[in-house]
Regions:
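Phosphate-binding site of ATP-dependent enzymes
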Residues: 141-221, 225-231
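ATP-grasp fold ATP-binding core
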Residues: 115-133, 154-171
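Well-ordered, non-membrane alpha-helical segments in soluble/globular domains
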Residues: 58-71, 91, 143-148, 276-285
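Short, surface-exposed charged micro-motifs
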Residues: 179, 241-243
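Protein kinase-like catalytic core scaffold
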Residues: 121, 161, 188, 240, ...
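Conserved N-proximal alpha/beta basic substrate-recognition cap immediately N-terminal to
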Residues: 8-117
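Extreme N-terminal starter segment of soluble prokaryotic enzymes
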Residues: 1-3
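C-terminal active-site "lid" helix and adjoining low-complexity regulatory extension at the edge
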Residues: 237, 246-366
Length: 366
């Protein structure tokens, strides 16, 4: 049995994949919500995939680590994928790749924006997968304004990263974003997105017929697997999806998501690809689905599950709530909503206010 651990709000990733695209896994994969973990006794032996690690609070991470310690005991006869003791999350991964010369672009936390930066840069959330929340910023003044605007929109500076921009456009001006999964060391090419925007998300994917043929060749050939394996290993990630580009033939890693969308779920594409073009992607989707299903089956222990009594320390239980990190607290969302009508006027004050906001946030942090 495979237990896929995830927060309740993010469980659609594996749930939709199994229900809509891989029903043969329904009796093998069980979704377990982090929020229910302490009340779920006994647990059972099997393979545990810990996803969405960036959504866990320190208390939630402590619960996971104490659980993993018990799963690793020989008598537990269980496997663990994505041990947080080894996993590098977004900031740590990008910083490590840059320092080792494996990524051209660097990263800094917003509360440490005095770090040397190579402009242009953009701002994004550290623990969410929403892409850039700012345009490209070309100097410190623009960066200060962007951070100030982010605070007024309900973001906390401690949750934000400043990421250096890396130009990856093709000679024709188009951008390519490659994606590949890993399951216990097995790399599986997922898709190739092509569009006209540098921050390429699914709504900007607009491939031509020729580019779809390139995508099919990429997925079937798994052409970058040898280059991706050491990156996944460095990141300590056994299950997840890497998003990356190629710069002069080298991998430029954008992120590795430990709870990625696997295939399109119940929601329609925000900007659908024309049907006559989209149909050409069906062989790619079928190939990927078959490969991922086989990879998931391969990590099952093959042993019948049996009850496993798990105990957590008193200190762990005291600090376990909340389990899940909230990027925008309710009170902050309410404040941002209340001041939204005044934002145009407030933005004009950003040049004056933002340095003080940033400085105050750093002082509160220290």
């Amino acid at each position: 049995m495979i237990y896929f651990l995830v927060d309740r709000a993010s469980a659609f990733t594996m749930r939709d994949f199994v229900e809509l695209h891989a029903p043969g896994l329904a009796n093998l994969v069980e979704i377990v919500h982090y929020e229910d973990l302490l009340q779920r006794q006994p647990l059972h032996t099997g393979t545990y995939i810990f996803s969405a690690l960036d959504h866990l609070t320190p208390g939630g991470m402590r619960v996971v680590r104490e659980l993993i310690d018990q799963l690793r005991e020989p008598a537990a006869e269980s496997r663990v994928l994505n041990d947080p003791a080894r996993v590098l999350l977004r900031y740590e991964l990008l910083d490590t790749l840059h320092r080792r010369g494996l990524n051209r672009h660097g990263v800094a936390r917003a509360l440490d924006s005095r770090s040397p930066l190579r402009f242009p840069v953009f701002v994004r959330e550290e623990s969410e997968h929403t892409g850039a929340i700012s345009p490209l910023l070309h100097d410190h003044a623009e960066l200060r304004r962007a951070l100030g605007k982010s605070v007024l929109r309900g973001y906390r500076l401690r949750d934000l990263l400043i990421v250096e921009y890396c130009e990856t456009a093709e000679p024709n001006g188009r951008y390519r974003r490659y994606s590949a999964f890993v399951v216990s060391g097995r790399v599986i090419a997922r898709e190739l997105m092509v569009g006209d925007e540098w921050m390429l998300k699914s709504h900007g994917n607009a491939p031509t017929e020729s580019e779809i043929r390139d995508e099919l060749e990429y997925v079937r050939g798994n052409t970058h697997a040898a280059q991706l394996e050491p990156i996944f290993s460095l990141a300590g990630i056994d299950y997840g999806r890497i998003d990356y580009a190629l710069v002069d033939g080298r991998i430029e890693t954008w992120e590795i998501n430990t709870n990625p969308t696997i295939r399109r779920g119940r929601q329609a594409d925000p900007i659908p690809i024309p049907p006559e073009i989209n149909t050409l992607r069906d062989p790619m989707r079928a190939h990927f689905t078959s490969a991922l299903e086989a990879a998931l089956r391969s990590v099952d222990t093959g042993l019948p599950p049996r009850p496993l009594a798990v105990r957590f320390s008193a200190e762990c239980l005291r600090n376990a709530t909340p389990m899940i990190h909230v990027s925008k607290p309710t009170w902050l969302r309410h404040v941002a909503s209340a001041i939204r009508p005044a934002l145009p006027r407030l933005y004009r004050l950003i040049d004056v206010v933002s340095p003080y906001v940033t400085r105050a946030s750093r002082q509160l942090r220290s």
